[in-house]
Curated annotation (Swiss-Prot):
EC code(s) of this entry: 2.1.1.72
Keywords of the record: DNA replication, DNA-binding, Host-virus interaction, Inhibition of host innate immune response by virus, Methyltransferase, Restriction-modification system evasion by virus, S-adenosyl-L-methionine, Transferase, Viral immunoevasion
Protein name: DNA adenine methylase
UniProt effect for mutating P126S: In damh; hypermethylating mutant
Length: 259
């Protein structure tokens, strides 16, 4: 079950098990949609939200972009696994223009396919000695075949309007892990999210949360205590890639918490 892009911690390997716990719904709300590995692979209609506006704008642009358009940019910049200077030129041009198509092409050539955006909105991922492959076009085609059911938004999770009949799926940054995209997530943000989920439960709205209770010796005591009010399913998975190449293969208690 492919996403639109490679994305740290994506749920494509876990999704079959997760979907077995999803309820019936009028609309699927993916509150932290990331690489779309969930949004693209559930029944619509879907609201795919992520606070990272450049990524959401990239998805919106991709709806009207052909694969030939992607190849034209790669040819124009003479990009390959060894074209570091050409990659840096493309990165410079994206940071000047904020053209979402350039961001999409950049991510194929950046380190671990990561999209790092700094506080100024600039793409900062270094060259990754990589380029497109067969899976790149496969992901693109999967996106194009499944994007019609999706409405995109780039709001803070507290600002998304949740309707009666929605099912709200959340896969937030994890408080106790060290991935790059978790660095702006604080205990206050965690509390705000848990309070939001409690309020949804009070309204009779179904939710499900992917998270980790323990990771490499750390414990999310806040989440563990909160989860006692709900159903907790313990999961086992292997991430698509581990950018920190941790030698610890065990010690992560990944869970799905739902009402």
């Amino acid at each position: 079950m492919l996403g639109a892009i490679a994305y740290t911690g994506n749920k494509q390997s876990l999704l079959p098990e997760l979907k077995s716990h999803f309820p019936k719904y009028n609309r699927f709300v993916d509150l932290f949609c990331g690489g779309l590995s969930v949004s693209l692979n559930v029944n619509g209609p879907v609201l795919a939200n992520d606070i990272q506006e450049p990524i959401i704008e990239m998805y919106k642009r991709l709806i009207n972009v052909s694969w030939d358009d992607v190849l034209k940019v790669i040819k124009q910049y003479k990009l390959s696994k060894t074209s570091k200077e050409e990659f840096l030129k493309l990165r410079e041009d994206y940071n000047k223009t904020r053209d979402p198509l350039l961001l999409y092409v950049l991510h194929f050539h950046g380190f671990s396919n990561m999209i790092r955006i700094n506080d100024k909105g600039n793409f900062t991922t270094p060259f990754g000695k990589r380029t497109i492959n067969k899976n790149s076009e496969k992901q693109y085609n999967h996106f194009k075949q499944n994007c019609d059911k999706i409405i995109f938004s780039s709001l803070h999770f507290k600002d998304v309007k949740i309707l009666d009949g929605d099912f709200v799926y959340v896969d937030p940054p994890y408080l106790i892990t060290v991935a790059d995209y978790n660095k702006f997530w604080s205990e206050d943000e965690e509390k705000d999210l848990l309070n939001l989920l409690d309020s949804l439960n009070d309204r009779g709205i179904k939710f499900g949360q992917s998270n980790v209770l323990e990771h490499h010796g750390k414990e999310n005591t806040l989440l563990k205590e909160w989860s006692k009010k709900y159903n907790v399913k313990h999961l086992n998975k292997k991430y698509v890639f581990n950018i920190y190449h941790s030698k610890e293969k065990n010690g992560t208690d990944e869970v799905y918490i739902f009402n």
